[in-house]
Regions:
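Terminal accessory/targeting
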Residues: 1-149, 241, 248-339
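Aromatic-residue detector
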Residues: 23, 72, 133-134, 158-163, ...
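A generic structural signal for nonpolar/compact residues at packed positions
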Residues: 72, 170-172, 216, 299
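Metal-dependent polysaccharide deacetylase catalytic core of the NodB/CE4 family, i.e.
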Residues: 75, 79, 100-101, 118-208, ...
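Alpha-helical structural signal in soluble globular domains
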Residues: 123, 160, 164, 189, ...
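A local structural micro-motif
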Residues: 131-132, 169, 199, 222-226, ...
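Catalytic domains of cell-wall/extracellular-matrix polysaccharide-remodeling enzymes
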Residues: 174-252, 308-312
Length: 339
């Protein structure tokens, strides 16, 4: 169990992609065909059944399926290549959306990528669910669109979301990976805008290493939800139950909650090259496995993906299937000592 949840194999391997990521293709779980199973939780259930046989009066607290919908807000302005803007006209026959992107600043309108943030929260509320929005505050780079949370049109959106009780978190930029100083600066700036002292979030591009837990702990963050593979959906940590990680290098528990990421829209569409219908089927299978072990189904869907008519529709289909499933409450889990 510790082998899976501590990501021991990633400490032992130097294999990484161009972004410094350990991929599913390199993992024991995918090579031996059990990445699709929460194997740590399954072992736990088997052990529970043995104990119940030995101690008939013993019953552990019941765990039920919960959902963690999260959204990395990578972009808030005009799409970098205009593909999405033109898509509004060609695919959806919505020329106004194209004008919104191209002329929005002059007309005082929010760009479609920023407007999609409100669509995300609206969809969640309509289905009795809750969403967490993870924001950046970084300069433009080869791998970051770059935006400033203090910009008036962005800050107004963030303030409105906070007033509506939407969870806001951090999405540290590409180059904060393995750079504690830069990470700390960004986290501090974002939390200042949020007027929050402790939040959670996810690293941009899923750039993660077991030592990333150390950096996040030092920055005072409450939880991380980066531990998922970019190239394949599944159970990277072998579990869908949030947990406090154990650092094999420091030989101690990390003061941080890990909420394992199970699936991401980009993984399905780009890395696995699945059609929207196939993506929905795979996501619901994953959610069902979480339900069996009483875990948390953690899904990442970017605001940009809602602008794609096919994947926007696929996301709504998943929400319909998950309708009124309780959200995972990380604050309650930490305060109660459940994790």
């Amino acid at each position: 169990m510790l082998f899976r949840s501590s990501r021991f194999e990633e400490l032992q391997s130097d294999e990484r992609d161009m972004h410094g990521r350990f991929l599913a293709a390199q993992s024991v779980a995918l090579r031996h065909n059990f990445l699709h199973r929460p194997i740590v939780d399954e072992y736990g259930l088997a052990l529970q059944q043995v104990i119940e046989l030995l101690l008939p009066g013993w019953r552990p607290p019941e765990r039920k399926l919960r959902v963690k919908l999260s959204h990395d807000v990578d972009e808030v302005g005009i799409p970098l290549d205009l593909t999405n803007s033109l898509g509004h006209t060609v695919k959806r026959h919505k020329p106004f959306a194209t004008l919104r992107d191209l002329l929005g600043p002059a007309l005082g309108l929010r760009p479609s990528l920023l407007e999609a943030v409100f669509r995300i929260t609206e969809l969640s509320k309509n289905h009795g669910l809750a969403s967490a929005l993870y924001w950046k505050n970084s300069p433009k780079s080869d791998w970051d669109s770059g935006y400033d949370l203090s910009l008036k049109h962005v800050h107004k959106v963030v303030s409105r979301l906070k007033s509506e009780g939407v969870e806001l978190g951090v999405h540290p930029s590409y180059y904060t990976f393995n750079d504690l100083h830069r990470l700390g600066d960004e986290v501090e700036q974002i939390c200042e805008v949020f007027d929050e002292s402790r939040v959670g979030g996810r690293q941009h591009f899923l750039r993660w290493h077991p030592r990333t837990w150390h950096d996040w702990e030092q920055c005072g963050l409450a939880y991380d939800s980066t531990v998922g593979f970019s190239d394949h959906i599944g159970f990277r940590a072998g579990t869908c139950v949030p947990y406090r990680p154990w650092s094999l290098e420091l030989d101690r528990e990390i003061d941080l909650l890990e909420i394992p990421l199970l699936a991401m829209d980009v993984t399905l569409a780009y890395y696995m090259d699945l059609a929207p219908e196939e993506s929905v089927e795979l996501l619901l299978q994953c959610a069902q496995r979480c339900k069996i072990v009483g875990g948390v189904f953690t899904l990442l869907w970017h605001n940009r993906s809602l602008l794609d008519p096919n994947y926007g529709s696929a996301y709504q289909t998943v929400l319909e299937a998950l309708e009124f499933t309780p959200a995972f409450d990380w604050k309650q889990a930490l305060s109660s000592g459940q994790c």
